[in-house]
Amino acid sequence: MKKEIQFSLVYRDMWQSSGKYVPRKDQLARIAPVIIDMGCFDRVETNGGASEQVNLLYGENPNQAVRTFTKPFNEVGIKTHMLDRGLNALRMNPVPADVRQLMYKVKHAQGVDITRIFCGLNDPRNIIPSIKWAKEAGMTAQATMCITFSPVHTVEYYVNLAEELIANGAQEICLKDMAGIGRPTMLGEIVAAIKAQHLDIIIQYHGHTGPGFSVASMLEVAKAGADVLDVAMEPLSWGMVHPDVITIQAMLKQAGFLVKDINMKAYMEARNLSQEFIDDFLGYWIDPRNSKMTSLLVGCGLPGGMMGSLMADLKGMHAAINANLAKRGEKTLSEDELLVELFQEVQRVWPMLGTPCLVTPFSQYVKNAALMNLFSKSMGEKPFSRMDPAMWGMILGKSGRLPGTLAPEIIELAKEKNMEFYTGDPQALYPNELPKYIAEMEQLGWDRGQDDEELFEFAMHEKQYREYKSGLAKEQFNQDLIERMRKAGKPIPESLLPKQPEISEDDELAAVAMALHMAQKQALAPAATLPVIRSTAWKRFNPYKV
């Protein structure tokens, strides 16, 4: 009997590996039935990661978006799944236990079936509590192993990690190859070893295409017993994203696996809709570099999705580094030469920093350390003279246990700064906070929402939620979009033009509102720069009680 391989469309990750934002609620409602009509997907990634935070950033309610997107899939039996950062849940920094626990209740009520729980350090202590809470809420707990390639991250390392996660209740295992640098045969060996002991455990493989291994990896893990493969579709497949379902389906079908057929008419319709969403507004935040693969990532191991921000950082430092080199009488570097030096420095400092998996946020920490070392070198300073303050939590153990060991100079540097290392459970450092947010919502008269979903968003993304409630997020997003459209020479739609606000006849309020209105109008002129209006009166007619 042929082995069946299922496909999951990682619709959320397609967008967030390409750019910043995800489609709006109304766009998700349009694409969902077409994805269903394609007939080849048993699962769809609907939310999680940064998707809900960016909903708030463009001034819309993420809870409504999740419910809207999951509902059609729930009705036809396609399983929905979300990305969950373990200790960090849906943000970049640690989250209190009570907020994490509430997340699973809220997401299950919103129609999410499976949570993919990962920790960038692969520390089981950050994953195991989520397994318990997810199952209690009625979700399927998919424990995740972040894949990378290093002397620390061996087949034995991953098999032992899977055993621990399964022993603590994991119902599924995901191999999250976020940089796509897992070697195909190694991945096959990991899957085969897990299946040899746990035949009924579902294994899902997630591999980005950046350095070019992922198609071969998918064939290897399928042969070894994997059950589900994450795929993308045009116009956002390949590049730094994921292989296209058409290619993977054809490859596996020829190899003798049982795979569902693709309704190509629906595929083309979904393709056209996604392109329409890009043209509407999402494309203004998509970095074109993310549409190209590069083998330069094989050595440094950085995830391709961060190439856009990496190149922006590199460009920002390029002139300063060359100015320092010229001042010291040394040869200046081209941008390409500096890029190669950066990748080499990443390879050098990565093991010195404990070999964390290069995934959010730890990939940023390692990249920042390497870039600052290049700057320090251009100044004639020692390596690690300048450190990103945010990375000390990782170094000191406050984010979890590092897979490797810290270099002696890093330990000595921490001692010089009178910093203390922490070996306890990271969650213990972050006390419960829900009572604080409940009290404030009551004081402000804010509704906690269906199934406490508004309470959850407030506690998870406090700053962004306040700006969403005040209307500031929508205003800032529209200003940013108008500026990007203006730079691209695109006409500004009437819907983005600021409306004359309706306010009281208070003279100060009227003056501030009119000044803001006129400034926004003027921003549409080719050479205009939007002025910042500062007044205490603004707070009076734009309160948080919305």
Please place each PLM-identified region on the residue numbering.
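N-terminal amphipathic alpha-helix/helix-capping segment at the start of soluble metabolic enzymes
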Residues: 1-18, 66-71
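Conserved, mostly hydrophobic/aromatic
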Residues: 14, 117, 173, 225, ...
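Active-site beta->alpha loop and helix N-cap motifs at the rims of alpha/beta catalytic domains
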Residues: 33, 42-43, 47-166, 179-184
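Terminal or standalone catalytic/regulatory effector modules within metabolic enzymes
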Residues: 36-54, 289-527, 538
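Surface-exposed amphipathic alpha-helices with a cationic face
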Residues: 66-74, 128-138, 188-199, 249, ...
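Glycine-rich phosphate-binding active-site loops on the catalytic face of alpha/beta enzymes
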Residues: 117, 177, 224-243
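Catalytic cores of alpha/beta
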Residues: 156-165, 211-227
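C-terminal helical cap(s) of enzyme catalytic domains, especially alpha/beta-barrels
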Residues: 237-262
